[in-house]
Amino acid sequence: MDTGIGQDIMIRSFRTIEKELKNQEIPLDKKWALLHAIHTTADFDMENILYADPDAVSTLYNKINGGEVPTIITDVTMAASGIRKGALQRLGVEVKCYLQDEQVAEMASSKGITRTQAGIRRAVEEHPTALFVFGNAPTALMELCDLIRKGKATPAGIIAAPVGFVHVQESKHMVK
């Protein structure tokens, strides 16, 4: 089987990362998420800080492969860009980011919220059960958590890596 140069590089990278892990007894589903997180960030401290609900990774994997997750929503376009297109196509999954939507810009301006918050509000209106991926905006993650508490969203899963120094810790605590 010819995996291609890019796939070969990724596999070699994952093997290198796995050799460097301090804990070799990590459950397979969490290890998969951890390898990807370290590969993305080049930060081996992820081994100490990555949080995943028990069975969350395997449950989400089964949902995606079972066709139960037709849509992934991202807070920003860069997060959408980082999701492998070949896998999406193979699984029939669509990725959407509402950040550039005109209605989102209008909503953000009229409500006095960030565009990413407005984007999540709009996304939940159309896709309340999607998988939500946050690669930037803590305010968007907080918005989703509020919508979940209000019963307006029941995500298939949440993958959250908000950045910055404002609202980041609060958003991470809210999602737990």
How would you describe each model-predicted region?
Residues M1-T71:
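Electropositive, gly/pro-rich neighborhoods at or near active sites that engage anionic ligands
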Residues G6, N23, L35, E68, ...:
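Generic structural signal for short, flexible, solvent-exposed coil/loop and linker residues
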Residues S58, H173-K176:
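Structural recognition of alpha->loop->beta junctions
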Residues L60-G67, A123, L147, G151:
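Hydrophobic helix-cap positions at the C-terminus of alpha-helices
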Residues V76-I148, P155-G164, V168, K172-M174:
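Conserved mixed alpha/beta catalytic, RNA-binding, or beta-rich assembly cores of soluble enzyme
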